[in-house]
Amino acid sequence: MKALQLFFVFILCSTARALNATASCTIDRYEHVDSVVSQCKSITVESFAVPAGQTLKLHLQAGTTLTFNGNIAFAYKEWDGPLMWIKGNGITVQGTNSHLINGRGELWWDGHGGHNNKKKPQLMMIQASGNSVFKNIKVKNCPLTCIGISDSHGITLQQWTIDNKDGDTKGGINTDGFDIARSDKVTIKDSTVINQDDCICVNQGQHLLFTNLHCIGGHGLSIAAGLYSTYEMNTVYNVTFTNSILENSRNAIHIKTIPDANKKGEITSITYDNIKLIGISFYAINVQEDYTNDGSTGHPLGNIPVKDLKINNIYGTMSGPYAVKVYILCGSGGCSNWKWSNINVSGAARSNSCNFTPNGFSC
């Protein structure tokens, strides 16, 4: 009998240890983050609030699987952020159907975005490698840029929903969906972005694929180069946008370079293919080499040439009094070897404007 009692005690103690081990790998308070991340490789994140001015740092061990299962919200402070920072090699980050990452952007929005003295934080920074996967993630109301991807190599983001539609009426500005820099072999697919700025914006990177996206509102599928001082950091190479829908956006396709003779770089081997447009209000295709945050200068430079630009099967509708199907403004020597085909867009209210003519398209 005594031996039997000891056996049951052992079983109960073992079960308790197992339960404690499981519980210790669940984050349900901000104070638990560091200990769980350092000890566990299978992590569940439940609901809690991140204190004002703090970054939720999920710097994961290699091979970790992290699952968002609750609602994460962030307290208000005027600062640069990011509010969340996910980092790791060979990691899987996923969400259940019940989770939400709520940036509470309505607390910061003022109709000025990043163009005044009121600081607004980026919602999330991702730095990952080793075939890491981020899937089924739901994000709401980013104060400024939603997702920044930097220093990442060989990662996939899929089945994301970024819902910033509240910003349409509450002053959301510069709420880019995904910004990419210093990265290669990044894929973003099967995702929806509702926002007030670029759906995708590539600042620097190579071997990037964006497919099966639905971008609503915002400013389109963009490449923006010239932000940095070095040639390498102003170079974008081998980027493909395909099989996507742009709906009620300002632009559909937008390539923009900053005219600064001291900043060199290049944009090469870019493909836009099979893009559907619905109600685009300004430009179906806009390539400009005179872009600044304060607006277009009207004086393009070829300091960052756009080469080997392939655009095919762009179709759909535009609406409104400012709609232009194609706008091209190249600096001297700034555009070469463009091949366009099957540009079938209706509803433009204004004529095309081009100072460079692509092969296969007549302005």
Task: Tell me what each language-model feature is.
Residues M1-N20:
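Fungal secretory targeting signals
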Residues A52-T55, Y76-G81, R104-L107, Q122, ...:
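Short glycine/acidic-rich loop motifs that flank beta-strands on beta-rich extracellular proteins
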Residues R29-Q39, V50-T67, A73-V93, R104-G130, ...:
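Extracellular beta-strand-rich solenoid/capping regions of secreted or surface-exposed proteins
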Residues R17-H32:
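Right-handed parallel beta-helix/beta-solenoid
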Residues G63, F68-G70, N89-H99, G130-N141, ...:
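Right-handed parallel beta-helix
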Residues E46, S249-C363:
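Extracellular beta-rich repeat passengers
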